From Swiss-Prot:
This is Nucleotide-binding protein AM1_1863. InterPro entries: DUF520 (IPR007551), UPF0234-like_C (IPR035571), UPF0234_N (IPR035570), YajQ-like_sf (IPR036183). CDD domains: YajQ_like. The keyword Magnesium does not apply. Belongs to the YajQ family. It holds the Pfam family DUF520. The lineage of its organism: Bacteria, Bacillati, Cyanobacteriota, Cyanophyceae, Acaryochloridales. Nucleotide-binding protein. The keyword Nucleotide-binding applies. One of its GO terms (molecular function) is nucleotide binding. It comes from Acaryochloris marina (strain MBIC 11017).
Length: 163
């Protein structure tokens, strides 16, 4: 009769879109009059972005450029976890921005508990950094997605692996 339907809740981002956003930000920084001579560098590592520039004022402008480019590439700003601003050599400042990927166990438990309390016919199971939601009714699953989108979570949630 009715088979079980499911989907996964993940927190992830497109790596290539992030690379493109940083490339566009670097180009704009080199072309903008107020940022042209600041020798600003944006370096991308697999786990973080490092920004090195002249002053905190310039750093704020670079943040603005980076965020604008990320939004245009359909990246959530919740993937950026800004670290502390530290002074570097030559009167420069540096900041590391950690890239948030995956749902930690505590947040997965909150999501799972919210689903279990609000929907009796829906099951949520934690599988590492993924929360699998399953039910016999597709309508219930769609309602769960709508309710999760309404909440303000500390990470960007995506829904994948529809079955």
């Amino acid at each position: 009769m009715a088979s079980t339907c499911s989907f996964d809740i993940v927190s992830d981002f497109e790596w290539q879109e992030l690379v493109n956003a940083i490339d566009q930000a670097n180009r704009e920084i080199k072309a903008r009059y107020d940022l042209k001579d600041t020798k600003t560098e944006i370096k991308l590592d697999p786990t973080e972005i490092t920004i090195s520039t002249d002053s905190e004022f310039t750093l704020d402008a670079v943040h603005n450029v980076l965020q604008t480019k990320a939004v245009k590439r359909k990246l959530s700003l919740k993937i950026f976890d800004y670290g502390i601003i530290e002074s570097a050599s030559g009167n420069r400042v540096r900041q590391a921005i950690k890239l948030q990927k995956g749902i930690d166990t505590e947040l997965a438990k909150k999501i799972s508990k919210l689903i279990r309390t609000d929907y009796k016919k829906v099951q949520a199971s934690i599988q590492g950094e993924v929360v699998r939601v399953s039910s016999k009714s597709k309508d219930d699953l769609q309602q769960v997605m709508q309710d999760l989108k309404q909440e303000d979570w500390p990470v960007a949630l995506q829904f994948t692996n529809y079955r």
